Amino acid sequence: MEGGGKFNSMEIEVKLFATLRDYLPKGSGRFSCKMEVDRSTRVQDILSRLKIPEEIPKIILINGVHGKKEQILKEGDVLSVFPPVAGG
């Protein structure tokens, strides 16, 4: 984090499921990682930071509730990202 300091940063948890797990940083848990981010961080910023391609469809939950890429995250949020469910 650049020039932020403790007052401008916060910790969130990111959980990636199925094929998206490949985008977790090295050394992460099996499905999740903790991230220190700026207080103005949006979901899209996290997806970009993890290098998840924009064109991959995603289902986004924040604390278990449907979220949007433009949504600003808060201290302690749990961001869960799933690929769409398909099958028949």
Placement of each model-derived feature along the sequence:
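Ubiquitin-like/PB1-type beta-grasp interaction modules and other compact soluble beta-rich domains
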Residues: 1-87
